[in-house]
From Swiss-Prot:
Catalytic function, reaction form: D-glyceraldehyde 3-phosphate + pyruvate + H(+) = 1-deoxy-D-xylulose 5-phosphate + CO2
NCBIfam families named in the record: dxs, PRK05444.2-2
Official protein name in the record: 1-deoxy-D-xylulose-5-phosphate synthase
Lineage: Bacteria, Bacillati, Actinomycetota, Actinomycetes, Micrococcales
Region described as Disordered: 629-650
Positions bound to thiamine diphosphate: 73, 113-115, 146-147, 175, 287, 369
Similarity comment text for this entry: Belongs to the transketolase family. DXPS subfamily.
GO biological process: 1-deoxy-D-xylulose 5-phosphate biosynthetic process; isopentenyl diphosphate biosynthetic process, methylerythritol 4-phosphate pathway; terpenoid biosynthetic process; thiamine biosynthetic process
Keyword Metal-binding recorded: yes
């Protein structure tokens, strides 16, 4: 039996010798490579925090001492030492979440995986401990150097420094990367700290001096190196960044030196005031395929061969992101006004090809979505057309800037929202399900949702030509799927995808839900119900022809992969009422609740967004047994009578 199998909780670490801790770290890395390669997940970040996480749990008493992980994707080691070692269904329905989750363990505090929030959480928790008299409890916030590029981190530091009586420890996990290499002035400063010759020279010289005395000298050196770190920190002025904030700084510490990390954390724990412990770590530590991966060091992987790191079943399907990557480059080649902006996710959002060919026209602003959006407004004012590429879930963080800096000023900015709708295994904070409801209320905005690769190219090209209002192009995660050709295109750009002789039901689909809408129509046809399926392409503002078609059908059904409350269906219903059209509207989408992790198909089935479920309900509405009921047929209409029992066959 290995050491890892004997660990059921953090206090089991206390009985281990230093040699056993080193052995445990090696076992954990072997476990992570073996298990995550089967399920996929955040491999590189977790390989880089093994010793740091073990040290935190040895020095502090979780859950009495609160441990908060920023973004949370580096919490696998934390899960392992807090009694969760069944990784067989990691990120799958019914299995462990890929991020901290309170329902899994009392050791998990913050579930959100959005970056730069941990210090604000730590500020609030430590204040609460003080107010309630729990002054013996510590708060430990683990934050990556990438998250330090987010402004919220510095707002929190400003407030933390205002109260020097709290037992708050900030562990900076500095691996020089967020998803990719960390950028900006903060990154340059930390890199200077890591590589400054004065620090390294003095540290290495002191090690050699003690080493002259053989084993006794080495032992003395190990005993004194915590103090040596502090001394060299002062000598080389590494704490200059934090001195004005009145927060004690310890480091930099080798984050893979278990003993050094424990000594630094013990010193921070006993200090009795806010302390920053700067740990230098290596993303992908101990796994050669990750170390060779220059792009992101296996930040997140699918199923891979653990020996080679190669995908087990490489997909040859074209992804939405790759279609965007090729098309934005083609558009930028033609139009020198187009510039790209990303928030620390150059490759994940597909701007890497643009950046490689036109490096002066693509700007990575770090994990700073608010700044990205307002900077884009400034670029538009200067005569350029910015394309801000984000994951859909992260545009939530910059809503005020979209509203007040872009829309109010009628700035021609295009937002490209990747991973829109249900994203699957990363859980509630990564589903891009709020963008439609959130953005459709912005004045002047134009919002598109392409159903396939051809429409993505079309709508992106149309978006970058709009210079007097914000535009949005949103698409899903994963592969694009087959082309869905229109039966015809109406004069306002709406595509008719399916139509029947009788106009019973108008089905309005948003983006990739077109496939589902067509299948629903086919099921209805088998029941003698005629349906028209349309893809508005540009869903906001609602095209005129969609409203007109709503008036000529007996029932309108909208299908979207965003939250249904305040979504596109709501907008269509309002426009119908304003036009004096009383056709019943059924709005289908995601419920206003946080959806757990699972595959896209599992989640859609869980919330009733399947062709079978939708068709069954629509049949009931046409029969008048379910509200909203379809408008009655005209008295002179000749139709094949339907039987109520046919409802079950839809």
């Amino acid at each position: 039996m290995g050491i890892l199998e004997t660990i059921t909780g953090p206090r089991d670490l206390d009985r281990l010798s230093r040699e056993q801790m080193v052995e445990l770290a090696a076992e954990i890395r072997q476990f992570l490579v073996a298990e995550v390669s089967k399920t996929g997940g955040h491999l590189g970040p977790n390989l880089g925090v093994v010793e740091t996480t073990l040290a935190i749990h040895r020095v502090f008493d979780s859950p009495r001492d609160a441990i908060v992980f920023d973004t949370g994707h580096q919490s696998y080691v934390h899960k392992l030492v807090t009694g969760r070692q069944d990784f067989s269904r990691l990120r799958e329905a019914g299995g462990l979440a890929g991020y901290p989750q309170r329902s899994e363990s009392e050791h998990d505090i913050v579930e959100s995986s959005h970056a730069s929030s941990s210090l604000s959480w730590a500020d609030g928790i430590s204040r609460a401990f003080g107010i309630t008299g729990q002054t013996d409890r510590h708060v430990v916030a683990v934050v990556g150097d990438g998250a330090l590029t987010g402004g919220m981190t510095w707002e929190a530091l400003n407030n933390i420094s205002d109260d020097n009586t709290r037992k708050l420890i900030i562990v900076v996990n500095d691996n020089g990367r967020s998803y990719a290499p960390t950028i900006g002035g903060m990154a340059r400063f930390l890199n200077t700290v890591r590589t400054r010759r004065t620090y390294r020279g003095l540290y290495e010289t002191s090690q050699r001096v003690f080493g002259v005395f053989g084993a006794p000298g080495d032992s003395l050196y190990r005993g004194l190196r915590g103090g040596l770190h502090g001394f060299l920190t002062r000598v080389t002025d590494n704490e200059a960044l934090y001195s004005n904030l009145d927060i004690k700084y310890l480091g930099p510490i080798d984050g893979h030196d278990q003993q050094a990390m424990e000594e630094a954390l013990e010193q921070a724990r006993d200090y009795g005031a806010p302390v920053i412990v700067h740990a230098i770590t290596e993303k992908g530590r101990g796994y050669e395929p990750a170390r060779r991966d220059v792009a992101d060091q296996f930040h997140a992987v699918g199923q891979i061969d653990p020996e080679t790191g190669e995908p087990i079943d490489p997909s040859h399907a074209v992804s939405w992101t790759s279609v965007f990557a090729d098309e934005i480059l083609a558009l930028a080649d033609e139009d020198p006004r187009i510039v790209g902006i990303t928030a620390a996710m150059l490759r994940p959002v597909g701007l890497h090809k643009f950046a490689e060919k036109h490096p002066d026209r693509v700007h990575d602003v770090g994990i700073a979505e608010q700044h990205a959006v307002t900077s884009a407004a400034g670029l538009a004012y200067g005569g350029l057309h910015p394309v801000v590429a984000l994951y859909a879930t992260f545009v939530n963080r910059a809503f005020d800037q979209v509203l007040m800096d872009v829309a109010l000023h009628r700035a021609g900015v295009t937002f490209v929202l990747d991973r829109a709708g249900v994203t699957g295994p990363d859980g509630p904070s990564h589903h891009g399900m709020w963008d439609l409801a959130l953005l459709q209320i912005v004045p002047h905005i134009r919002l598109s949702a392409p159903r396939d690769a051809t429409r993505l190219r079309e709508e992106l090209g149309e978006a970058v030509k709009v210079d007097d209002a914000p535009t949005v192009v949103r698409f899903s995660k994963g592969s694009v799927g087959d082309e869905i050709e229109a039966v015809r295109r109406l004069d306002d750009g709406v595509d008719v995808l399916h139509e029947s002789a009788s106009k019973d039901v108008l089905i309005v689909t948003v983006g990739p839900m077109a496939t589902m809408g067509i299948e629903v129509a086919e099921r209805l046809a088998a029941q003698g119900i005629g349906a028209t399926v349309v893809d508005p392409r540009w869903v906001v503002p609602v095209p005129r022809s969609v409203v007109e078609l709503g008036g000529t059908h007996r029932l309108v059904v909208t299908i979207e992969d965003g939250v249904v409350v305040g979504g596109i269906g709501t907008r269509i219903r309002q426009d119908l009422r304003e036009a004096g059209i009383d056709t019943g509207v059924t709005e289908l989408g995601l419920p206003d609740e946080f959806l757990d992790h699972g595959t896209r198909s599992q989640i859609l089935e869980r919330v009733g967004l399947t062709p079978q479920h939708i068709a069954r309900d629509v049949v009931a509405q046409v029969l008048g047994s379910r509200v909203p009921s379809a408008r009655p047929l005209p008295e002179d209409a000749e139709r094949v009578p339907m039987r109520a029992e046919d409802d079950e066959q839809a």
